[in-house]
Regions:
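Short coil/turn segments at beta-strand junctions that form active-site/ligand-binding loops
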Residues: 1, 99-100, 162-163
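Hydrophobic beta-strand scaffold residues
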Residues: 101-103, 184
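Asp-based, Mg2+/Mn2+-dependent phosphohydrolase catalytic module
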Residues: 108-109, 115-209
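Generic enzyme active-site microenvironment
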Residues: 4, 104, 166-167
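N-terminal helical cap/lid subdomain that shapes the substrate entry/recognition surface
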Residues: 1-86, 97, 108-114
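Anion (oxyanion) recognition and catalysis
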Residues: 93-97, 178
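Short amphipathic alpha-helical segments and helix-helix/interface helices
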Residues: 20, 89-93, 103, 150, ...
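Generic structural signal for small/hydrophobic residues in well-ordered secondary structure
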Residues: 6-9, 49, 103, 134, ...
């Protein structure tokens, strides 16, 4: 069984209001563009890979009418992510001993850089040491819940769809995965998804069937 995790809200904790407040301090109202499960406007474009960080920063300057620095804009956007609790990392390491682990996420270059350089690694480690495959919206040009994104995952992993278990905090995304034949479970943002697994990291029998 391959276990596929969402990133934001499942592994990393999110604080939308903290991000909105960070942009407000810069004089920019982010609220109309930011969502919990999906983004709009320029935020959607950076999550689909249709715009890079320079374009993102330029759009914020254009909309705000303020001469904001790229670094300040990027730091404010990074404020959306807070931390990956240690117990979740420890559980992932135990799960990996029994199951192939992957990530499937609507994310962007700034947020994933935090994953690669801060959240998932110890000195000398790489994200690839924990996850065998990483599927990111901004690299794929697709976003959940688009059917094509899940089909690409199935094609890449070369495993029967019913042997792929997707954990996401959005029921819309979970249902989209099920429509392609994948299995899916809601993964609450409070980390209680860890209860799907035994203490040693094995998926509990009732979820294997």
């Amino acid at each position: 069984m391959t276990i596929i995790f969402d990133f934001g809200g499942v592994l990393v904790q999110l604080d939308k209001q903290r991000c909105i407040d960070a942009f407000a301090k810069l004089g920019f109202d982010l609220a109309p563009f930011i969502g919990t499960y999906a983004q709009s406007g320029i935020l959607s474009k950076i999550e689909r890979g249709e715009a890079g960080i320079p374009e993102f920063c330029e759009e914020v300057r254009r909309v705000s009418g303020l001469p904001l620095k790229d670094n300040d804009i990027c730091e404010a956007w990074a404020a959306f992510l807070t931390e990956v609790p240690r117990e979740r990392i420890d559980m992932l390491r135990r799960i990996r001993k029994h199951h192939r682990l992957c990530v499937l996420s609507n994310t962007n270059e700034i947020h994933w850089a935090l994953a690669e350089n801060k959240y998932f690694v110890k000195p000398g480690e790489r994200v690839e040491d924990l996850f065998s495959h990483v599927f990111l919206s901004y690299k794929m040009g697709l976003e959940k819940p688009e059917k094509e994104m899940f089909e690409k995952v199935i094609e890449t992993l070369q495993e029967p769809a019913d042997r792929l278990l997707f954990l996401d905090d959005s029921e819309v995304n979970c249902e989209a995965a099920r429509k392609t034949g994948m299995r899916s479970l809601i993964a609450p943002a409070d980390g209680s998804w860890m209860n799907y697994f035994e203490a040693d990291g094995r998926l509990k029998a009732e979820y294997e069937a």
